[in-house]
């Protein structure tokens, strides 16, 4: 059995508690733990990143937790601003890189999987741009790491390795 969890970054400790209580349960943390950058967190991106990163590091210590990488908006800290053209994969990769690389470093490629989150994601970029951004972020990864990020980790998390 597996459990997909979508929650916000202040709730990440709850995933750790569930993972500790049920070590045989495969837990998949969706959307990089959804860092909140609006509402009461608006203008506090550096503080949010620091808090989120520490929580991701803590949750990643549980071997039964995997993480889905994606579902981040483009208009995050470092975003260039509104433009008449949609962002390309290079711009998306630049915006997402610090968040996704933090997750990959914490969980390792073997427990990290890319996710598209379409059709919701089309609000920020096209399907092709999203996946090309993932390819850009993965450019320095080994062939084995790329296999994990793009398919292997998901197959293990959902126990469907026989389909690869």
Regions found by a protein language model. Give the residues of each.
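Mid-to-C-terminal alpha-helical segments outside catalytic/metal-binding sites
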Residues: 101-102, 106-113, 120-164
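Catalytic pocket-lining loop regions of alpha/beta-barrel enzymes
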Residues: 1-113
